[in-house]
Amino acid sequence: MELLKQLSDNLIKRTDTRYLRYMYHQIPWSNRMTVLVGPRGVGKTTLLLQYIKLNLQMKDTLYVSAESIYFANHTLFETAMKFSQLGGKHLFIDEIHKYKGWATELKMIYDNLPTLQVVFTGSSVLDIYKGTADLSRRVLVFTMQGLSFREYIGMEKGIDIPVSTLEQIVNNEVVLPEEIEHPLALFHEYLCKGYYPFSKDEGYRMRLNQVVSMTLETDIPQYANYTVMVSRKLKELMQVIADSVPFKPNMSTIATTIKVDRNNLPDYFELMERAGLIAQLHESTGGVRGLGKVEKVYLDNTNLSFALSSSMPDIGNQRETFFFNQMRVNHAVFNSPISDFMIEDKTFEIGGKKKGQKQISEAKEGYIVKDDIETGMGNVIPLWAFGMNY
């Protein structure tokens, strides 16, 4: 325990707190048990350490990673109980999905150690509700995404820009500070390597490929009990998607291409989406049926397009991927039967600066979203502005 505490304290002391992500202010940190899930690489660990460093006393706090070798000979519950007996008040557990039987032991901690507050992180494929009904009533679940364009500017330039609502964006009310006279250069930089907080690291593209590989080879198979053979098929499927997006999925064709049972493909797509690798755009059916069929499949974010595509990503694909990625954090985004996207009653057509109004002429409330323009007018909105929504 002493060594575990020392490692925890050292990590906390080294944590950079200069920039705080959007999720930092959304989590009710005083809740007794909270889980933060999200794709690999989006900064969940850093967020925990920042909160500890800025708000808690280290003597009351323990941060552990569930994949630590320490847990080869110790249980989570045993560790939590000993820490609580020593006066500990706040336990932070990273990578909870790496610990077998995590749900049972967290329930034991909750029920038997009422003075101990627990915050833990997990993979986004982790289903906190699967087989853990008792735990799900005790824990608050938050999902964290990668950097918005707004956050990227904050991290890269140290410039704080307020969040803009969708109404402010479509009314062309997004105002950038004077330090950013021309946003397009930064925007194109973001599309290439701005979504993940480790964008400044050497070998960014290599690390991003490692994130994808670990998700497909470890996270998804571990959760779904897939064999090594299935994990290989997931990698093949990922490459097919990367080279084809955006596309309307034909399950029979894809199944033939990668030699899998077509009946398994919807499950593969769902898990890859939950893991933050792809995004599926549905038609809106409304009513009790909820989500309609999948109309298009995209990579989750534009950085993945640059990292995984075997050629230069299509510019139209980049534009649509960016819009879908940024807007679905706070909004339900659906396929438009006459254009590209729908949010509530608003229709959005995405294109370059020469894009015309024809596509949305019959829309109840239509907007043209243009890349390569700095400012908008009327129902013409610059694409980069949609990166200010979180």
Name each model-derived stretch:
Residues Y195-P337:
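Accessory nucleic acid-recognition modules appended to NTPase machines
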Residues K44-T45:
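Conserved lysine of the Walker
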Residues M58-H90:
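Short glycine-rich substrate-engagement loop in P-loop NTPases that contacts/grips substrate
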Residues L36:
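Hydrophobic anchor at the beta1->P-loop junction of P-loop NTPases
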Residues R40-G41:
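Walker A (P-loop) phosphate-binding loop of P-loop NTPases
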Residues E2-N10, S123, Y129-M238:
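Interdomain motor-coupling "hinge/lid" segment immediately C-terminal to the ATP-binding subdomain
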Residues M1-T17, Q50, L54, A66, ...:
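A cross-kingdom feature that marks ATP-driven nucleic-acid transaction machinery
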